[in-house]
Swiss-Prot record:
Primary role: Forms a fork protection complex (FPC) with CSM3 and which is required for chromosome segregation during meiosis and DNA damage repair. FPC coordinates leading and lagging strand synthesis and moves with the replication fork. FPC stabilizes replication forks in a configuration that is recognized by replication checkpoint sensors.
Assembly, per entry: Component of the fork protection complex (FPC) consisting of TOF1 and CSM3.
Protein's GO biological process: DNA repair; DNA replication checkpoint signaling; meiotic cell cycle; replication fork arrest
Presence of the UniProt keyword Magnesium in the record: no
Region (Disordered): 26-58, 695-725, 1052-1121, 1176-1256
Similarity-based family: Belongs to the timeless family.
Protein name: Topoisomerase 1-associated factor 1
GO (cellular component) term, any one: replication fork protection complex
Source species taxonomy: Eukaryota, Fungi, Dikarya, Ascomycota, Saccharomycotina
Stretches with biased composition (Basic residues): 1060-1086
Encoding gene per record: TOF1
Amino acid sequence: MSVSDIETERTRYYDAYDADDAELDGFIVSDEENDNLENENRNERDPDSRNQDDVDEYGQPQIDRIRTMTEALAPNESQASKVLRAHISVLVSALGGPDHTSNISPPPYKLGHDALACLKDIKRWIKSVDDRQDSYQVALACAESGLVINDLIVILCQWDSKNKKKEDFRNKRTMEKIMLACLELLVLLTWSVELRPESSDKQKLLYYDVKKAQIKYKRAILTYNKGQTLKAVIRLVLPIISKERVDREPKDNAIMRLVLFFFRNILYVEPPSPSISKKSSKTIVVTDNMPEGVSYDDISLSATISAFSKNRVLMLFLTLSSGIGVDFDSRFLGPTLLECIHLLVRGVDPNDILKLKQMRIPTEINDPGNSSSPFHNVPPASSTTGLQLQDLLAKESKIKNSQTQSMSTRHGRFGSLLSIRGDHSMSFVVSGQEALINAGQTMQKLDRSKKWKNRSYFKYDSDEYTKSSNTTYMNYGGLVILHEFIESFLAGGCFNILIEKLSSVFSSSDSILEKEYETATFFLTIAWFFQYKREKTVLYSSGTTNLQPIGEEDDRNDFGSVGAALSQVNFILLVKYCVDSFSISPKRWSSLHVVLICLKELLEISNTLFTRSSSSAGDEEQNELDRELAEGIISHLLVTQDFLSILYHLPQTASRHSPEYLKVCISVVHILLKTLKNFAEEDVKLFIQTTRRNSKKKANKESNDQSDAVEQVDESDTEDKRTHARVTRERKINYERTEVKFFHQDTVSTYIEYLSRYEDLTHYEIKKCLTYFHRLFVVRKDFNGLYRLDFMQVLHKLRDYLPSQSNIRGQVDEFIYYFMKKFKASIERFPNPIEILFPRFEDAESKTYLATGELYIQTEREIRSANVKRFEPGKPLEFVRHFEDNEKYKILVSALYEQGLSNMLVCLVEDLQRIHGIKQLDEDVDEVLQLKEDFRQYVLTNSHLRLLLRTVGLIPGYSLSQECQVPSKLTSSDIDSAITLIKKWMGLQPATFEDGKDPSYFLRSTGDTVDRPIDYSDSEDDIAFEITPKDRPNESHYDMLTELDELERAISGAENREKGKARKRGNKSSSTIKKKSLQSRSRRPPRFNVDSDDESELRKEVKSSEFVHDSDDESDDEAFFEREERLRQMLNSSGGIVNAQQLSEFKKVWASLESTGGIATASQVVRAVESVANISDGVDTHSHQDDKSQPSDSENEDSSEEVSEVQIRKRLRIEDDENDSDNNVSENYVSAEEGEEATPTVKRKKRLVISDDEDE
């Protein structure tokens, strides 16, 4: 039970005594310590004033040996603690004691004159010191004084004996008050304590002592006079139960709940789990956590249940459960009563109870010497220690079998030493017989000898409500008693009544996480009884037993005895509990573990009923009822998309939590996939609710249509509500699409991690994993999903581990054979050995490329969804100058405060405090920032918040899917100082700066367009020079940057163009399309545009490293304009460039000119262009004469049309649109397809004529 629940319960029942606690304030005064301090100071000032008794005969100060020994034995005990123990001892002595003057043996207990006042004083001490100061000093003082064992238990048992004999008391009312005071102290002193990170240092120091004291209390309560204390406590509540509900007072209900608290505490007390550091050389001994003279058998669950049965405690539970909600207050008593039931069955396997049906119950258990009694059926180990020994022997036998399989048959007792020589002349030495089997065992032996420097710290954050500190062992007698109680509990309708009333209690609460422990107990109890009933149904259906258990009615084949837990209210509660636990930050993993356990049992019931109704040929009416119940369970569970999305996500992260959490996650996925498969085969239709926001336009239209008919009180509020109204609709579940989401690569990794623990798994659990992999690899044919090196290694190790005679070994061999057959074919067809080292990416582009080697073509729907607004990282900021940390936090907190994000700062501080607590326990742990969903967007988009996070030392992500990382190098002290500064300036808002300046005055942009790591691909270019803001508002920055890149590449000259071939010039529409394609390939992030095989070299472009220099202050404007002027003059002198030959020749000479940098060689360029033009004209004339389609005179006149300089520049763009230069199309011809004759097309020849006016 959590610490917060403990404090809440104590506060409820003992607030009435808070006024009396003032009497004890300042009661303990360490006057002696002050006097000693004054004497020491006086002696230091005047050494001669010391008392003669304080020095020995040699003049040296005498040593108080007794005091020194006391301080050495109890170094942590202060003088105030000693005084406190003395006061408690005085109160316990004044309470009473054995009356040795009496002739009765043993002597009866005689109460003191102020016994009631002493009990009240002790209770005030507990509340004033232990509760308020977070300590256990009073509790330990009571244990040392023997208050519980020597006084409270004896007083209650003596009072019960007198009431049983119907003896009269002098003051009956006072005696009842004393008994209630004794019960209150018992509840306080047996209340469960837990060691948590937030526990105080005093609590951590005294934790084990308190636990051992409580174990002594439990043993005394269960064994004193055969558990008469339990009967005495029940006697206190019997008069209240006999009253009518209307006649009971609030005090009566409080007493009933106090009694339930006492029984709950007795069930909850167990030994603390051993916690020895790995660095310690101390051997863990089981008895270290037990007090002297107490064994596990004295406080085991079997002993507790046996004592409860003898003293009618179980009968009290049945009575209260059957009358809850009618005779008893369900809200006041229901949760505590349910917790008692839960503690009775926690850790008990229902199969162990159901196995008793196959054996005859011994009638003479207390007569082991009777040979005629069937004691040969009773297990030989009937004690807790014996059962523990059986488990240990079974584990030892399993380990020995695995070792003998991996050892050679001959010379097994001799040692061996192997030398392995690897690459680079490295040699390794391996010793042991295991290394002689094969190479795999040799390398595995070598791997085990490695010592990893970076140790992984693993914490289990999901077992708070599901796992006890010790394994539960039940002997035969305890199982028989528990079986009888459970059958009576189910047959009498107590379970249905209790669950029905508690469902209404939880559904009426404001938040289901308000009482998280009670909610977890509720669903865990339901899950246990579901499992018990399901196993019993399967047992009777198989016909393995014909015995009729005691107290069982004809409820074998249906679930009527647990029908209340299958109500729609519980399904709604379960879904809400799951969604709330997952949505809150940080996530409640322990609650999600509880949800998965209950969900597993519900799916098991549904699958069992559906399979039985489909395969059974018996009563059709019963089969129809089973089918309806099975479909109803699934339809009520898979009711919302949010819940189904959580089920997709939980298995993806299950490997980060405890083995129990991982196991139940695997079971849920396995059963859910099996259920979906059965429903798909039977064509069962299920519908799920999806929600979407109503569009604002439609909402405004509806508002206008109804404005005349409905009077609007507050128009703005109504408009806002309608705008944000959520529309709920149902859609049919697509089983295939739903199934695909459970084959995510993270889920596959979870299964691989689970299978890697094959030594701890049963054959059935291994088969679950193989079924999953078979469905993914064989049925769905998703081969790349399992082409992973870690999976291959696990399969190899699993095959060597399994015995060759087992059935599961044959299934593993068949799967490995099929897997390697497909893998060899895939690696030969599409070699990608690097990809097997990592899990596959789940995006469609990566999956398509790895499977087929081709790029993914987006559908129209995906293109439309890609155009939806996406959040980009905020513009990076920096401080204008150097500031101290105090000033930095002042600026950033003030900026966020002015933006109205004060609530976000509060949430940030809370999560930083959570991280600070984790860092205090382990500095090397890696954590992530977990803000609320409403504020996660700001971590990406708000530049001020991103700078604040970096100032703290965090690493913000670059997308909504990336978490804000807390690096391991960030210490807890750094986080603590950051929290202090943020809190400081949050409390001083609005802050003032010098000259009344705004916080943003001290910040500036870093100049980067996007706050993300610079990682351009080969298809991206860098800007060689700055550009002015665009004049056309509809033109994107990508268009302008692409044009500048093309111009720069044309001027600089590229060497990819084949000599003698000009670039094809298309019409306006084709150029527009090409322009758009170039835009998508230039500056935008890669979107896996599909290119043909001829376009594979399209992205070989000039990088910006040619233009970027070390200094940003240097400008290349003068060189740029000088080069432009030279190009202009040469074009004017040569008369323009007409064909591909001229262009090619021009490029060559221009390249040499650029290399030499001489202006005088410009004439060479002109002569080269003119000579090539003359040759080209002859070729063109000859080709035109042979052409049938001779152009007209008007076309020839148009051919001499002037061409602008911009067109010439476009010709000079050196950016190939085709991959192979042989496939380039010249300006005068359009090549035909293979096998067809090429049809020449006449192109108009144009010359460039630039007048002097144009030149100016």
